[in-house]
Structures are given as C-alpha cells and as structure tokens.
Amino acid sequence: VGFKAGVKDYKLTYYTPEYNPKDTDILAAFRVTPQPGVPAEEAGAAVAAESSTGTWTTVWTDGLTSLDRYKGRCYDIEPVAGEESQFIAYVAYPLDLFEEGSVTNMFTSIVGNVFGFKALXXLRLEDLRIPPAYSKTFQGPPHGIQVERDKLNKYGRPLLGCTIKPKLGLSAKNYGRAVYECLRGGLDFTKDDENVNSQPFMRWRDRFLFCAEAIYKAQAETGEIKGHYLNATAGTCEEMMKRAIFARELGVPIVMHDYLTGGFTANTSLARYCRDNGLLLHIHRAMHAVIDRQKNHGMHFRVLAKALRMSGGDHIHAGTVVGKLEGERDITLGFVDLLRDDFVEKDRSRGIYFTQDWVSLPGVIPVASGGIHVWHMPALTEIFGDDSVLQFGGGTLGHPWGNAPGAVANRVALEACVQARNEGRDLAREGNEIIRSAAKWSPELAAACEVWKEIKFEFPAMDTL
C-alpha cells in the first residue's frame, strides 16, 4: 500500500514556515484561539488543512492528486500582544482552489467548516489578500465612484441621504410623500429601510411607483438629480430581478440590496444587471454584526467589505466613527480605504494585514449612517471626505418642523462644512463654531441645533495620526 492509514498531525503537511507566498495566492490572516494543550503550529496547520484539501484522516485518493499544488499552507504564526491564548496564523491558498468570479465559493472554502473545528476554541478571519489574478475574474461594483458622480452631476462634497422612518407601517402614498419632502429640502438620496421589502401594509410595486413620482417632482423643483434607494431584496432571486427590472422601467437611478441576508450569489447577479442597465446599487449590511461583532470569532467587517467590492455594489454602510474611540476610528478608515482606493498599503495599526492592489476595480462609496445629526457634520466631513454618503434618518425626520426643513438643515450644515474646509479651516477644532455661524442665517438649521444640542468631539485633529 502506498500510504499509511490513520489519523495524522496536520503540521507535518500543512505547516510550512519556509514557504514564500506566490503573487497569485489568496492570503488569509486568522486570529486563532486553540483549545488548551493544542500547540500553535498544529492549530494553524489545522486551519490551513480544513479550509483547503485536508480531512481528518489519510485517504488513499490523496495519491491521485498533487497535494503540493492544491493544499493551503500555514506559512507564518505571530503572537497577539496582550493575549496569551491567541495568535495570528497566516495561510496561503493556491488560486486553483476557487471558482472564478464567485465570492460564494471563496467563502465556502475559507470560512466554511473550519469554523466549527473542535481543536479550536474560537477562530476569526481578520483579513484577506485578494490577488489581481482573482479580482480580475469579478466585475466588481456596477459603476464606481467617478461614474456615479458623473451620472448624478454632483462634485466636491459628500452626498446626503436619509432613511425613511417609521420604517414599517406607512402606506405607499404617505411613504412617497415623505421621500418627496426630503428630496425637495435638499437631500440627494432617500432610502428604503433594509426591512422594507414587500409587506402587507405596503407592497413593493406601489412603493416603487410613488417613490418614482416623488423623485421626478423633486427633480423638477430643485433642478438637481435625485434618487431613492428602492430595496429590491426579495425571497427569491427571480423576484429580486423582477423588482430591479421594474425600477429600471420607471427610469430611477438607483436600487438597493441587503447583501448578507440576500446572499452573495443573488448580489452578484443583481450587480451585473445594474451594470448592464445603468442602475446604481446601494448595499446595506444587515446581519453583519452577527458575523463581525465578536472580537475572537467570526470575520472582521473589512473582509465582508472586500467581498462586497468583488461581488458588486456602489454604496455600502460602513459605520459612523463619530464619538467612538480613536483606535476604532483608524480601523474604520482602514476598511473605508479598502473600499475606495485602488492600492492600499499594509498597515497593522489600521487593521490592514496585507497590501491590497485592486488593479482598477471600481471603488465603493462608504455610507455613514446611524444616530448622527447636524452637530456631527464637521466631524463626518473631516473623517470621510468627499467620497461618502452621510445618511441622517432621525437626524432629518426628527426635525421639529418636519422633513423638508430637516433636509434643509442638513444641506446647509454640509455646505457650510465643505466651504469651511475649502477655506482651510480646521473642522475638528472649529466644528461647533462653523455650525453655529451657519445657523444664524438658516432658521431650519438653528431649530435643528436646538433639538440635538452640541456634541463633544472625543478626538483631536486628524493630523495627529
């Protein structure tokens, strides 16, 4: 017999510290917490094995293939500062293990069964290096940042959005009215809540019609291009495509998808349709915290963000950073760069484990959304820069005078911040002053400032990084 039966140590085959990763390999950084008594090399090798060619015992069919060509390799192990029980395992996967153009297949391998592996107490995928040889098999975002600006004819400032609330319970007619008021007041976009699909109180087709009417009415009155993220997410791919096609027939500029609950297969199909039919695609990340919230198990959001850039989306929600801790801010900006930029250098202080070259794959605009209002505007402008969407749901609709004045307040605050920045003022230090002086000539902004009161900026100026 040409092989020895029985259970074997993974590290004999899958731990290869002398290996030099190839340019075409997909590289992964895992945070591994092994069970007590399992050595780091064995645990790292087990991760490499179980997420590639390995199984728990030797099988005779191993002899029918070239393991050296197809196996994942744990090529480096480094300790985690301050964590005795954890380490980072670096694994290289040969490109041939993955189907071209399929995020679904990539994740099934890399974050599949291995996460239930008994020898590990916990496992977290911190980052992935996607080689150009693989990213080039994806279409990526339907349009990207520059094409979106050209389509909307909006330059030199962040875009403004608003999620329509209450998210569940409005009739289609009243929903459309709320959309119209926000767009008329000065927002660029309004948004279907991620929960809004097609429920008994408001079927999707009625919503699409009334929102389209709102868009065209607001465009005619303001002379600006407007959009509403029509949520095409549905229970089946066929139904999702039907909704996207109807949106295209209405002539609206943008649709929306919940990419994690809807799934990568559905998302990639929708992104391809959007590219072919001139629709922008807004992506919501509902369910991300189930995957990325725990620090020692699951998958960091930067991996989900990279996966979305490959699968396709023009906007994606990326948290707000405002008022959070400094370290968290650097890490958020790290994956914001991974979404927008063409080339991102390795920088462990920002959580970026690998240098990532996207070779001209279009970028994705990060969306800051959740609990923000006019007083946050200077910080948001400073942190996210021009290529972002700032989304104020309650921060628009919660205005004491109604939706349109709420939209006016946000637009005035944004224009004031952009002007101040362009004049060379320091938004981080003078933020409250900029908003206060703008409020003197905008009663809508003054009223908004009253309701939400000034916030404390918990961080110093940007240039101290």
Curated annotation (Swiss-Prot):
N6,N6,N6-trimethyllysine PTM sites in chain numbering: K4
UniProtKB keywords: Calvin cycle, Carbon dioxide fixation, Chloroplast, Disulfide bond, Lyase, Magnesium, Metal-binding, Methylation, Monooxygenase, Oxidoreductase, Photorespiration, Photosynthesis, Plastid
Cofactor-binding details, from the entry: Binds 1 Mg(2+) ion per subunit.
GO CC terms in record: chloroplast
Any GO BP: reductive pentose-phosphate cycle
Residues noted as binding Mg(2+) in the record, renumbered to the chain: K191, D193, E194
Top EC class of this enzyme: lyase
Cofactor: Mg(2+)
Pfam families: RuBisCO_large, RuBisCO_large_N
Catalytic residues, chain numbering: K165, H284
Locations listed in the record: Plastid, Chloroplast
InterPro entries associated with the record: RuBisCO (IPR033966), RuBisCo_large_chain_AS (IPR020878), RuBisCO_lsu_C (IPR000685), RuBisCO_lsu_C_sf (IPR036376), RuBisCO_lsu_fd_N (IPR017443), RuBisCO_lsu_N_sf (IPR036422), RuBisCO_lsuI (IPR020888)
Job of this protein: RuBisCO catalyzes two reactions: the carboxylation of D-ribulose 1,5-bisphosphate, the primary event in carbon dioxide fixation, as well as the oxidative fragmentation of the pentose substrate in the photorespiration process. Both reactions occur simultaneously and in competition at the same active site.
NCBIfam families: PRK04208.1 (NF003252)
Protein family per UniProt: Belongs to the RuBisCO large chain family. Type I subfamily.
Protein name: Ribulose bisphosphate carboxylase large chain
Gene: rbcL
